[in-house]
UniProtKB/Swiss-Prot annotation:
One of its GO terms (cellular component) is chloroplast thylakoid membrane. Its main location: plastid. GO terms for biological process: photosynthetic electron transport in photosystem II. It comes from Zygnema circumcarinatum (Green alga). One of its GO terms (molecular function) is chlorophyll binding. The keyword NAD does not apply. The chain crosses the membrane at residues 21-36, 101-115, 140-156, 203-218, 237-252, 457-472. It is a multi-pass membrane protein. Belongs to the PsbB/PsbC family. PsbB subfamily. InterPro entries: PS_antenna-like (IPR000932), PS_II_antenna-like_sf (IPR036001), PSII_PsbB (IPR017486). This is Photosystem II CP47 reaction center protein. Binds multiple chlorophylls. PSII binds additional chlorophylls, carotenoids and specific lipids. The keyword Iron does not apply. It is found in: Plastid, Chloroplast thylakoid membrane.
Length: 508
């Protein structure tokens, strides 16, 4: 045919059999990729430390999505929560991957069958004998079936009626596990962090989809609307489908980046706003205050802080710290976290407590500044020692650790104090193994960042695709250079040029 690369999809225009074939092949590729990627991730995933080396630190992308839907066990004998497993059953990580690969193979065979047997009676209009599709009817069928699926997911899978439930956690990502969820039908169902809204919204949207599907199956579109929206043209279907996909992509980019019940921090890592707002720092501070109010020593109070909570309060886990073109998992950046050194408390020689000002998200370097409880600068690591007034040496700053591996240890020599002050800029202080993976010390983003970036980019791309194909189908006559009021029939396809005066015409 000599088609240019950007027009190859015209081969499935007016060819319903092969249109089905290419969609089957596309689904086969998607399913095959998902299964293969899952097996690859399982091959490189280390489940030994779910606290300091969780899936999101290791750059896992499909494992978090399987986990949030209720898959937590492996045929390898491990569970995502750290327990050993004897019988994982079919719906393990490997089982789900295998099912996707088998499905991919079946879809591949179906695609070949439909490509070979493309000219079926089913696709021919009884009146004209030409290939045609009843697009409004097909729309109704698809709407009905997707409504059934949506309702089934919300009413059975999420609620645990027939299924495992979904991943549910506390606001600080400490107690996450898979459990059934009761639908939330009140105003609380609109809270993006309430998992009950996932169940109720799927049930409601499913019912709406079923009713809308039945409506479109039983009611024909008015002629004016049918013609106005070009409902007989398959490019209209392409245009509206792209619109649905780009809208969904924009929505999930937002829910992933800003966080919601469907994107828990245990599976995808913290959001950047939790660092910006000191979210975990405030919770740690609240717990310490409560412990001290109960006459518990500072050392004991900090020892009660879960290592998991302290690790969230570290800038290296902020997805906005990794550059978009720094490939690799977080562990390839600052290394594999080995242990929490403890909370560093800085004091001047008078015994006043000083607080290291934390690095904002979009800074790579930041001055080391220590302030008192009123926010007044009391000490720093100066850029020019000759002009310094508040240097660690001049102010006589010391550091003592509470909780963690250095619990009860204090340092007063300036070099060590400066070292820990620099590290305290980045939140809680952890020890990292950079040798195992040859980590380069440059922060990476988490799967939360990659997912958001990918979906935002594709949504923008698909938005323009929607405008393009929508314009093509609505203004087809204009682009073809044909006046819709023309009283002569034009033989399409005989000439390549638009508006060619030599095109064969036949007066009606």
């Amino acid at each position: 045919m000599g088609l240019p690369w950007y027009r190859v999809h015209t081969v499935v225009l007016n060819d319903p059999g092969r249109l089905i074939a290419v969609h089957l092949m596309h689904t086969a590729l998607v399913s095959g990729w998902a299964g293969s990627m899952a097996l690859y991730e399982l091959a490189v995933f280390d489940p030994s430390d779910p606290v300091l080396d969780p899936m999101w630190r290791q750059g896992m992308f499909v494992i978090p999505f399987m986990t949030r839907l209720g898959v937590t066990q492996s045929w390898g004998g491990w569970s995502i929560t750290g327990e050993t497993v004897t019988n994982a059953g079919l719906w393990s990580y490997e089982g789900v991957a295998a099912v996707h690969i088998v499905l991919s193979g079946l879809l591949f065979l179906a695609a070949i069958w439909h490509w070979v047997y493309w000219d079926l009676e089913l696709f021919r209009d009884e009146r004209t004998g030409k290939p045609s599709l009843d697009l409004p009817k097909i729309f109704g069928i698809h709407l009905f079936l997707s409504g059934v699926l949506c309702f089934g997911f919300g009413a059975f899978h999420v609620t645990g009626l027939f299924g495992p439930g979904v991943w549910v956690s506390d606001p600080y990502g400490l107690t996450g596990r898979v459990q059934p969820v009761a639908p939330a039908w009140g105003a609380e169902g609109f809270d993006p962090f309430n998992p009950g809204g996932i169940a109720s919204h799927h049930i409601a949207a499913g019912i709406l989809g079923i009713l809308a599907g039945l409506f479109h199956l039983s009611v024909r579109p008015p002629q004016r609307l049918y013609k106005g929206l070009r409902m007989g043209n398959v490019e209209t279907v392409l245009s509206s489908s792209i619109a649905a996909v780009f809208f969904a992509a924009f929505v999930v980019a937002g829910t992933m980046w800003y966080g919601c019940a469907a994107t828990p921090v245990e599976l995808f890592g913290p959001t950047r706003y939790q660092w910006d707002q000191g979210y975990f720092q405030q919770e740690i501070d609240r717990r310490i205050r409560n412990s001290v109010a109960e006459n518990v020593s500072l050392s004991e109070a900090w020892s009660k802080i879960p290592e998991k909570l302290a690790f969230y309060d570290y800038i290296g886990n902020n997805p906005a710290k990794g550059g978009l073109f720094r490939a690799g998992a977080m562990d390839n950046g600052d290394g594999i976290a080995v242990g929490w050194l403890g909370h560093a408390v800085f004091k001047d020689k008078e015994g006043n407590e000083l607080f290291v000002r934390r690095m904002p998200t979009f800074f790579e370097t930041f001055p080391v500044v220590l302030v008192d409880e009123e926010g007044i600068v009391r000490a720093d690591v100066p850029f020019r020692r000759a002009e310094s007034k508040y240097s660690i040496e001049q102010v006589g700053v010391s550091v003592e650790f509470y909780g963690g591996e250095l619990n009860g240890v204090s340092f007063s020599d300036p070099a060590t104090v400066k070292k820990y002050a620099r590290r305290a800029q980045l939140g809680e202080i952890f020890e990292f193994d950079r040798a195992t993976l040859k980590s380069d010390g440059v922060f990476r983003s988490s799967p939360r960042g990659w997912f958001t970036f990918g979906h935002a980019c594709f949504a923008l791309l698909f938005f323009f695709g929607h405008l393009w194909h929508g314009s093509r189908t609505l203004f087809r006559d204009v682009f073809a250079g044909i006046d819709p009021d023309l009283d002569s029939q034009v033989e399409f396809g005989l000439f390549q040029k638009l508006g060619d005066p030599t095109t064969r015409k036949q007066t009606v």
